[in-house]
């Protein structure tokens, strides 16, 4: 009898009221919840798994990719999403550097990010299985909490579906699409002639470690003998290669994909089992075929229990982003976040498809995504963020990666704050409050391409102990000119002359070089050849030579110098990059359907040495910390010191009441994944607040991009006195943001 009474009590529904309910605790949902909570919105974050992070969690183990894709191929170069996802990625590395498995430390870092917020209540193992609507609004979401057997009901004026599959919005009747649009609908030339149900498929990742002795492996009975599968003969081609991670280990293959021709929601279990059979079978082939001797001491420690899902439902918002917007960078007045991953559309049948595993359809650098893609066209209080936002399948190939999705989540959480502030709907935020939304997003370090902040400082004067010259003169090693290399130079007026360092180890030779120009300030994308020239290099030459481009920069504010291959010639390079002045490997190519660049570029980790730029161009002055951009956009937009000893950056201004001061450091936005601590981050410094009294705030052990300080009094100036970073030669600061 007592047991029956307990059972009845357990089945009673518990009711909870919040300002904002976020369903889905992946990175998108986390960022939506954190953004809202930090502005005082009482938020419930609901996830159906025992851990946070979604595809980035320990259960799935997918890397957090974004606009700076593959760290070397994005033409925007310094393209990594900032804001909350930058904070989370740096936190993950800092607490997870000795846990490449994405295991316990990884999960703990994500827990920390959410549990630090007093306005978030976290509900894990909680599945939303019921949605109640009143008219065109969701009034409540009913959930069952697994294991506890509790029945929970969440009521709120605002909801966000960040589930990936769009399960809550679908239950509410929100309009959505699933599959591929035909060409006629949006005139996307990458779309098929007719619509279909095809989506991108799923992938299961795994983890290995290297042991001191050989590790035997026996294929489980359920796994495939992959040598008997139809795709086996094609392995090693069509992007299906056995790639290793930077640690030299096999950690999973993105191209082990299945399910795009099925229903990735309804057929989830079938898809997952097929992938398991393939993964265990592939590891058997790697270990026991004799063709991978380097794997002898590798041990398979984990096959992720969940498949990483790329695509399923896509909701319909007030705007549907499409391929033409991505390629043409449609200038949306309601820009809410950036994207920049290629339009990555995978083969219909995944690993079983005879075509390439994917086409990385070119995107011309970062672009803005509108706020209207983040709320429902027909459910008036429903936001969404993640891979289920309002876009075509082709555009979704670019927006679906996790760092980009998380930036969308931050926009949603900030939009929810404005909805609560004004008692309005998401659509009303678009119609009436976009300038305020964008101002808040910029303040919180969200990147909106081409937008800059105004700190409203009167009579501001910036000075510094020193500023780096516009040069890269540390000749550390030689790089043979066996390929075509490009030096990208942001300049304010023109380049009449400069010096580069080279060595000729053969007979007298000719250095052939070009000057190119581009149009997009957010990119390093030369579009046209301005002039071509030749310079004679004597036999045995070893040192600096002068070049005379005599050109103005293009619309993007840059001059590109391309050095063509030459036998016997080598360029001197520096291992340390100068922010904003990258070096590229360049290959000329014909325009094609999938890649409209005339020149294909890969960012080089070795940087061409140059000096004596004329006319002199001071790119790294103290005044850059008030530029309002806080990342390269046309110009590098940061202060760089000349050396590290005794440096100080000072800003004085007319007396002003200051709420907060934000310092923005250089975490090297050119790297998509954070796999090492950026040497350029200022670790130790003192912040000096100047007014009626001077206050010195010591900071030690910083590793992040943005440091925030509450002030709450009148100031006449601030100063930053850096004392150490993580090994960089100079100190670098993007912004000193004074509010």
PLM segments and residue spans:
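Conserved N-terminal/central alpha/beta ligand/cofactor-binding core
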Residues: 7-15, 35, 41-42, 47-137, ...
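Beta1/beta-strand and adjacent pyrophosphate-binding region of the FAD-binding site
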Residues: 14-26
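Flavin (FAD/FMN)-binding glycine-rich loop and adjacent Rossmann-like elements that form
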Residues: 55, 125, 147-158, 162-494, ...
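Conserved beta-strand-loop-beta-strand element in the redox core of flavoprotein oxidoreductases
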Residues: 132-153
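Short, surface-exposed beta-strand/loop patches at domain edges
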Residues: 564-635, 727-739
């Amino acid at each position: 009898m007592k047991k029956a009474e307990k059972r009845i009590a357990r089945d009673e529904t518990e009711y909870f009221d919040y300002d904002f309910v976020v369903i889905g605790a992946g990175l998108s949902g986390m960022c939506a919840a954190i953004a809202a909570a930090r502005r005082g919105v009482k938020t419930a974050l609901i996830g159906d798994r025992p851990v946070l992070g979604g595809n980035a969690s320990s259960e799935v183990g997918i890397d957090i990719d974004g606009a700076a894709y593959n760290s070397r191929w994005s033409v925007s170069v310094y393209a990594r999403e900032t804001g909350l996802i930058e904070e989370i990625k740096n936190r993950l590395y800092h607490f997870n550097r000795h846990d490449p498995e994405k295991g316990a430390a990884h999960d703990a870092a994500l827990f920390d990010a959410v549990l630090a917020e007093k306005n978030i209540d976290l509900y894990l193992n909680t599945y939303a299985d019921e949605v109640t609507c009143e008219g065109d609004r969701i009034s409540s979401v009913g959930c069952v909490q697994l294991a506890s057997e509790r029945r929970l009901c969440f009521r709120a004026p605002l909801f966000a579906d960040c589930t990936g599959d769009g399960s809550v919005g679908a239950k509410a009747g929100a309009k959505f699409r699933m599959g591929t649009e035909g060409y006629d609908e949006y005139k996307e030339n990458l779309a098929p002639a007719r619509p279909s149900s095809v989506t991108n498929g799923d992938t299961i990742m795994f983890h290995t470690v290297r042991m001191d002795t050989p590790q035997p492996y026996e294929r489980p009975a359920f796994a495939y003998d992959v040598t008997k599968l139809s795709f086996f003969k094609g392995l090693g081609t069509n992007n299906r290669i056995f790639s290793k991670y930077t640690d030299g280990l096999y950690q999973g293959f993105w191209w082990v994909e299945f399910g795009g021709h099925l229903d990735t929601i309804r057929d989830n279990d079938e898809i997952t089992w097929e992938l398991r059979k393939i993964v265990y079978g592939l590891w058997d082939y790697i270990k026991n075929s004799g063709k991978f001797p380097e794997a002898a001491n590798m041990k398979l420690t984990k096959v992720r229990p969940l498949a990483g899902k790329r695509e399923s439902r896509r909701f319909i918002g007030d705007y549907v982003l499409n391929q033409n917007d991505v390629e043409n960078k449609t200038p949306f007045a309601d820009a809410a976040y950036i994207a920049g991953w290629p339009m990555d559309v995978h083969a219909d049948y995944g690993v079983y498809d005879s075509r390439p595993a994917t086409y990385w359809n070119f995107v011309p650098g970062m672009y803005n995504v509108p706020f209207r893609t983040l709320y429902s066209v027909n459910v008036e209080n429903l936001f969404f963020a993640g891979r289920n936002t309002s876009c075509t399948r082709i555009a979704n190939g670019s927006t679906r990666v996790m760092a980009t999705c998380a930036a969308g989540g931050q926009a949603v959480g900030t939009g929810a704050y404005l909805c609560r502030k004004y008692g309005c709907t998401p659509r009303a935020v678009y119609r009436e409050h976009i300038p305020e939304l964008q101002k808040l997003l910029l303040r919180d370090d969200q990147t909106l391409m081409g937008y800059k902040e105004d700190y409203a400082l009167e009579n501001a004067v910036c000075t510094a102990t020193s500023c780096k010259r516009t040069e890269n003169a540390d000749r550390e090693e030689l790089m043979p000119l066996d390929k075509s290399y490009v030096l990208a130079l942001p300049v304010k007026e023109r380049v009449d002359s400069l010096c580069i360092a080279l060595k000729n180890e053969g007979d007298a030779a000719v250095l052939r070089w070009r000057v190119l120009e581009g149009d997009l300030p957010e990119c390093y994308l030369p579009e046209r050849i301005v002039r071509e020239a030749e310079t004679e290099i004597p036999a045995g030459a070893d040192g600096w030579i002068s070049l005379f481009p005599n050109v103005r920069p293009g619309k993007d504010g840059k001059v590109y110098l391309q050095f063509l291959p030459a036998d016997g010639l080598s360029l001197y390079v520096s291992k340390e990059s100068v922010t904003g002045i990258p070096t590229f490997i360049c290959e000329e190519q014909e325009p094609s359907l999938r890649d409209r660049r005339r020149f294909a570029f890969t960012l080089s980790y070795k940087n061409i040495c140059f000096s004596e730029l004329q006319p002199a161009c001071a790119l790294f002055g103290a005044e850059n910390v008030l530029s309002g951009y806080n990342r390269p956009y046309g110009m590098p937009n940061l202060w760089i010191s000349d050396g590290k000893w005794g440096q100080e950056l000072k800003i004085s201004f007319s007396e002003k009441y200051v709420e907060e001061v934000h310092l923005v450091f250089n975490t090297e936005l050119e790297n998509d994944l954070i796999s090492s601590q950026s040497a350029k981050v200022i670790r130790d410094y003192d912040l000096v607040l100047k007014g009626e009294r001077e206050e010195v705030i010591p900071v030690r052990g910083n590793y992040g991009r943005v440091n925030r300080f509450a002030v709450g009094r009148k100031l006449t100036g601030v100063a930053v006195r850096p004392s150490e970073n993580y090994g960089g030669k100079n100190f670098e600061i993007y912004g000193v943001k004074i509010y």
